[in-house]
């Protein structure tokens, strides 16, 4: 059976799939058969997968780990969760990296691989896999896939880049973020730790999109 972009499990147009004609058990069995027959598998993963696996971004988790940032910047619309806080207009680079180094640590670097990600990849270990993900937490790499099998459309928590885009190279910042995390004081890092582009000398930025 030829699969087109409009097809789903039962050959019906995906635009009509909201009107389901089979129960979930039947759909799951059909999906399992197709996965077994497939030579190549493309995994699409969004924030819902990491959330289902137990990742925390807001609520009491944010209040417990980012209380000093809420105290300094207020509990307005920004300081509610790790997503919103990333858009706060931090007054200087020391403050910007003071926040982002912590988010990188808690949102990616310090996270262990989740059982859900390991379970998924183990179930598909005999297949040729590629992952297209909007997640920045690096879970698929931690679960065992090589970086050439993963494309993170919104970047990740592990790299930084020239804010002026003077060149395309990404720089691994995991060691730097750990140092920033230890040196942070009053939500800011020391000025000497602020990263600068090695090519143009300008500011650096997270390898992330909004």
Q: Language-model segments: which ranges?
A:
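Conserved catalytic core of sirtuin-type NAD+-dependent deacylases
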Residues: 1-210
């Amino acid at each position: 059976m030829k699969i087109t972009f409009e097809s789903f499990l039962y050959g019906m147009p995906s635009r009509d799939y909201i009107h389901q004609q089979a129960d979930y058990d039947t759909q799951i069995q059909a999906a399992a058969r197709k996965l077994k027959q497939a030579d190549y598998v493309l995994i699409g993963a969004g924030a819902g997968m990491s959330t289902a696996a137990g990742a925390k971004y807001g609520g009491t988790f944010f209040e417990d780990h980012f209380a000093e940032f809420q105290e300094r910047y207020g509990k307005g619309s920004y300081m509610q969760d790790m997503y919103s806080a990333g858009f706060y207009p931090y007054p200087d680079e020391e403050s910007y990296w003071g926040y982002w180094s912590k988010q990188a640590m808690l949102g990616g670097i310090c996270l262990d691989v989740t059982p859900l990600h390991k379970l998924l990849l183990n179930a598909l270990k005999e297949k040729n896999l590629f992952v297209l993900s909007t997640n920045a937490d690096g879970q698929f790499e931690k679960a065992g896939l090589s970086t050439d099998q993963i494309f993170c459309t919104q970047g990740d928590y592990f790299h930084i880049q020239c804010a002026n885009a003077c060149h395309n190279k990404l720089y691994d910042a995991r060691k730097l973020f750990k140092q920033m995390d230890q040196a942070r004081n009053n939500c800011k890092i020391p000025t000497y730790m602020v990263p600068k582009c090695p090519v143009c000398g300008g500011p650096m930025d997270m390898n992330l999109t909004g």
